[in-house]
Amino acid sequence: MNGIQVDINRLKKGEVSLGTSIMAVTFKDGVILGADSRTTTGAYIANRVTDKLTRVHDKIWCCRSGSAADTQAIADIVQYHLELYTSQYGTPSTETAASVFKELCYENKDNLTAGIIVAGYDDKNKGEVYTIPLGGSVHKLPYAIAGSGSTFIYGYCDKNFRENMSKEETVDFIKHSLSQAIKWDGSSGGVIRMVVLTAAGVERLIFYPDEYEQL
């Protein structure tokens, strides 16, 4: 056949990506996770209202960045392992969940595009945050940020984060941080979703663009 010949294997795959802004922050009563909601395929916005905050156990949640398919699959596998762990040993700790994430990400690091933040609450350790970047290492931190939009807010977060903030202060901190990430990062946008984990249980919050764009 005459005409232009194209090597399909050399074309970039149109993988759906959570090019994103995610974070989790400990505060005096627990921990709060936050994320934007834009999903992209290259320069195309595939979904404006994606939920990047995923439950893996009652009070253990994760923020997902990287390949949407990879991170959804990992979260599903971790949820299965934690349910199995619960039936044998009782309620898992946040550290246990982070270890399962780390094992999966490290063992498959050459095949996955996944950056995960794991956060949870239990009566013994209270609120905890673990970040698992590309490659599968794990780091416990008082707060963590990740995704393409995080590049723009490292300075802001470092200056404004304080330990033992109140719930209201922490929600405000996350809202301000993610609003700046969304402002400067083309792969971040949509609504800001949050999950609050405390002794009282799980609370979900959502903030629309008209509530944060003027910050």
From Swiss-Prot:
| SUPFAM superfamilies linked | N-terminal nucleophile aminohydrolases (Ntn hydrolases) (SSF56235)
Reported EC number(s) for this entry are 3.4.25.1
Q: Which domain of life is it from?
A: Eukaryota
Q: What class of enzyme is it?
A: hydrolase
Cellular component (GO) terms are: cytosol; nucleus; proteasome complex; proteasome core complex, beta-subunit complex; proteasome storage granule
Q: Does the keyword Protease apply?
A: yes
Q: Name one GO molecular function term.
A: endopeptidase activity
Query: Does the keyword Mitochondrion feature in the UniProt annotation?
Result: no
Subcellular localization, as worded in the UniProt entry: Cytoplasm; Nucleus
This protein's name: Proteasome subunit beta type-1
Gene source species: Saccharomyces cerevisiae (strain ATCC 204508 / S288c)
